[in-house]
């Protein structure tokens, strides 16, 4: 959810 501000790959 926060992949757009924190590109950690946790979809």
UniProtKB/Swiss-Prot annotation:
The record's subcellular locations are: Cytoplasm; Nucleus
The phenotype of cells or organisms lacking this gene is: Simultaneous knockout of tal-1A, tal-2A, tal-3A and tal-AA is embryonic lethal. In embryos chitin secretion and formation of the cuticular exoskeleton appears to be normal. However embryos display a loss of denticle belts and dorsal hairs. Segment-specific epidermal sensory organs are present and segments form normally. The cephalopharyngeal skeleton is lost, and the head skeleton and posterior spiracles are deformed. In the developing leg, tarsal constriction occurs but the tarsal fold does not form.
**Which InterPro entries does this chain map to?**
Tal-1A_2A
| One cellular component term from this protein's GO annotations in UniProt | cytoplasm
Q: What induces it?
A: Polycistronic RNA up-regulated by ecdysone.
Q: Does the keyword Cytoplasm apply?
A: yes
Query: Per UniProt, which keywords does this protein have?
Result: Cytoplasm, Developmental protein, Nucleus
Which GO terms fall under biological process for this protein? Answer: actin filament organization; morphogenesis of an epithelium
Q: Name one Pfam family in it.
A: Tal-1A_2A
Classify the main location: cytoplasm
| Subunit-level organization | Interacts with Ubr3.
Physiological role? One of four peptides (tal-1A, tal-2A, tal-3A and tal-AA) produced from a polycistronic gene that function redundantly in several developmental processes. Required in early stages of leg development for the intercalation of the tarsal segments during the mid-third instar stage and later for tarsal joint formation. Promotes the post-translational modification of ovo isoform B (svb) into its active form which in turn initiates trichome development and promotes tarsal joint development.
What does the further note read?
This protein is produced by a polycistronic gene which also produces tal-2A, tal-3A and tal-AA from non-overlapping reading frames. tal-1A and tal-2A produce the same protein from different reading frames.
The protein's name: Peptide tarsal-less 1A
In which organism is this protein found? Drosophila melanogaster (Fruit fly)
């Amino acid at each position: 959810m926060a992949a757009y501000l924190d590109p950690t790959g946790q979809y």
